[in-house]
Amino acid sequence: MGDWLLNLPVLWMAVVVFAATYLLAASIYWIVTRLAVNDRARAFKSVSPGMLPPLGILFALLVGFIAVEVWNSYEKAKVAVATEASALRSVVLLAGTFPEEQKARINALVDRHIEVAVNEGWPAMARRKLTLSTLPTSLIEALRVTLELKPADDSQRIAQSEMVKAIHAAADARRQRIVISQSAVGTVKWAGILLMGLCTLVAIAMVHSDNRLACAIALTLFATGIALSLLLIAAYSRPFTGEISVRPDLLKQVITSGQPSSNP
C-alpha cells in the first residue's frame, strides 16, 4: 500500500479502506445482478454454495499468516527500542562511578546519540530510508571514551567492563530496530489478500444472484470483514510508520540533560 495511506491517522485510514471495500462490493453486486438474466442466471445459480466455505477459509488463512508476521515485527520493534533504552540507561548509571568530568562527557555522548535517533533516525525509519551504513558516531565515541578510562579501583574496573557491554548491547539493539524498520507487507502479499477477497465476493454474489436482498446483505457482511482485516494489517504493517507505531519515548527518558542526578 502507498505511503500516503499508511501515514494517515487510523480513523481516516479506516474511512479510506472501508469506503474502497464497500465500493468494490457494490460494483460486484451491480455487475453480477445485471448479468444474472436468462442463461447467465442459470449458470450463476449452478455455482455450488459449497465453494464459499473453502474460499472463506483460504482468505482467513492468508490474513492470519500475514497478521502474525506483521504483529511479530511490531513487537520485535518495541523490544529493540526498550533494549536500547535500557542499555543506554545502564551506561548513564555506571558512568556515575567515575569523576564528574568523565561522567559528564559520557552522558553528553549518550544524550547526543538519543537526540540524533529521535530527530533524524525516527523520521528516516518511518520512510524506510535508514540503513546500517549510517554509523552511530556518538555511540562509537562513547565506546572509545569508555575504553580510555583509567579505573582507580575495582569498582571502576567492573563499571568500565559493564559499560562496554551496555554500549555494545545498545548498538546491537539499534541495528535490530533499523533492520525491523525495513520490514513491510510485500506487494505480492497484498495482491494475494485482495485477489482472494475479490474471488470470494464474486462467488457470494453469484450464489445469491437470484435474491438481491440476500446478495446485498452477504456482500456487505463479508466486505466488512475484508475491510477490517485490511485495516488491522495496514495499521501495523510498518512498525515505525503511521499513527500506530513504535515511538522513541523510552529513549527520551534516558536523556540526562536537565534532569536531576538522583531520585527525590
Task: Specify the residue positions occupied by each region the protein language model found.
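Short, Lys/Arg-rich, polar N-terminal cytosolic tail immediately upstream
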Residues: M1-W4
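Membrane-interface segments at loop-to-transmembrane junctions
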Residues: R40-M51
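A generic, lipid-embedded transmembrane alpha helix
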Residues: P49-I66
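Short extracytoplasmic/periplasmic juxtamembrane "stem" segments immediately C-terminal to an N-terminal membrane anchor
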Residues: A80-T97, R247-S261
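Structured inter-helical modules in multipass membrane proteins
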Residues: S90-Q182
